[in-house]
Amino acid sequence: MSAEVALVYRVLPDSVEVNIDKLKTDIINKLSPKYKVDKVEVEEIGFGIKALRFYIRMPESEEYSSDEVEELLRSVEGVGGYELEYFSRLSF
């Protein structure tokens, strides 16, 4: 069995007016089906601003990359910024 890579991204909307649920759905739709989104958390930052934390899994392969994930995140309307918080190789 091949190894997988786990990624955790924190995504910020570009304004407080962004519907966080729609942003979450748009990002999941953009990443799927190529990348597996295991979990999404909503984080209250303050002043009405919320961030999304995406737990993503992908095969360890040249066909998959964190660079591509970031390109996909940038292409979603409403994404103001993102940060890769965690990156780890998983093998079972």
Curated annotation (Swiss-Prot):
InterPro entries, per the entry: eEF-1beta-like_sf, EF1B_bsu/dsu_GNE, Transl_elong_EF1B/ribsomal_bS6, Transl_elong_EF1B_B_arc
Keyword Transmembrane: no
Keywords: Elongation factor, Protein biosynthesis
Pfam families per UniProt: EF1_GNE (PF00736)
One GO molecular-function entry: translation elongation factor activity
Keyword Protein biosynthesis: yes
Top-level taxon: Archaea
CDD domains: EF1B (cd00292)
Family assignment from sequence similarity: Belongs to the EF-1-beta/EF-1-delta family.
Free-text function comment from the UniProt entry: Promotes the exchange of GDP for GTP in EF-1-alpha/GDP, thus allowing the regeneration of EF-1-alpha/GTP that could then be used to form the ternary complex EF-1-alpha/GTP/AAtRNA.
This protein's name: Elongation factor 1-beta
Organism: Pyrobaculum arsenaticum (strain DSM 13514 / JCM 11321 / PZ6)
